[in-house]
């Protein structure tokens, strides 16, 4: 069977592994996931959208146009109730340096220092886009509600996972197994919404 190559517009190995696990768990065969390190470099547009959906779609369009491959891209972040939904689309660079998880977590804790437990509600949000060259564009969204803890806990995950306690649980996202996180997380929920479109790509190669 010919494999449908699908580009994920990311160099984050954990994101690539997450989508591969979700495809495997859903029994979707015939899709080969590749990341940005597996294709020739191209100019990546900055994330300037006002919403997660705008950023995800822009990244997916860029990847599909540059490589000729169907491209999946996501934009995700943390929306904290007490901060009026921030850091939102600025989540990865909340402290001023893109991708500095420790600094971002430290700043968030400082901003919520005097916020009582009952007002520490938050949700992870993920928008995922799939763009097929010369074909369809699909944009989906997943949300994961919870609260922000008082200190980082757990070694797994990335981003704000060590601070985020999902609703109905007593451990942080960073303390969950990969399988448990896939089943519940915002990105897992969004990616599962893309499964029919990804399965259709696999069907086209049979």
Curated annotation (Swiss-Prot):
- According to the UniProt entry, what is the EC number of this protein? 3.6.1.66
Could you tell me one molecular function GO term of this UniProt entry?
ribonucleoside triphosphate phosphatase activity
Q: Does the keyword Lyase apply?
A: no
Cofactor: record remark: Binds 1 Mg(2+) ion per subunit.
- Binding-site residues for Mg(2+), renumbered to this chain: 75
Going by the UniProt record, its keywords in alphabetical order are: Hydrolase, Magnesium, Metal-binding, Nucleotide metabolism, Nucleotide-binding
S-S bridge residues: none
Q: According to its UniProt record, which reaction does this protein catalyse?
A: XTP + H2O = XMP + diphosphate + H(+); dITP + H2O = dIMP + diphosphate + H(+); ITP + H2O = IMP + diphosphate + H(+)
The protein's superkingdom reads: Bacteria
Please tell me where substrate binds in this chain: 10-15, 76, 158-161, 181, 186-187
Name the InterPro entries for this protein: dITP/XTP_pyrophosphatase, ITPase-like_fam, RdgB/HAM1
A GO biological process held by the record: purine nucleoside triphosphate catabolic process
In this protein, the active site sits at 75
The Gene Ontology CC terms held by the record are: cytosol
Pfam families in alphabetical order: Ham1p_like
Job of this protein = Pyrophosphatase that catalyzes the hydrolysis of nucleoside triphosphates to their monophosphate derivatives, with a high preference for the non-canonical purine nucleotides XTP (xanthosine triphosphate), dITP (deoxyinosine triphosphate) and ITP. Seems to function as a house-cleaning enzyme that removes non-canonical purine nucleotides from the nucleotide pool, thus preventing their incorporation into DNA/RNA and avoiding chromosomal lesions.
Protein family: Belongs to the HAM1 NTPase family.
Subunit and partners: Homodimer.
**Protein name from the UniProt record:** dITP/XTP pyrophosphatase
Species of origin reads: Nocardia farcinica (strain IFM 10152)
Its lineage reads:
Bacteria, Bacillati, Actinomycetota, Actinomycetes, Mycobacteriales
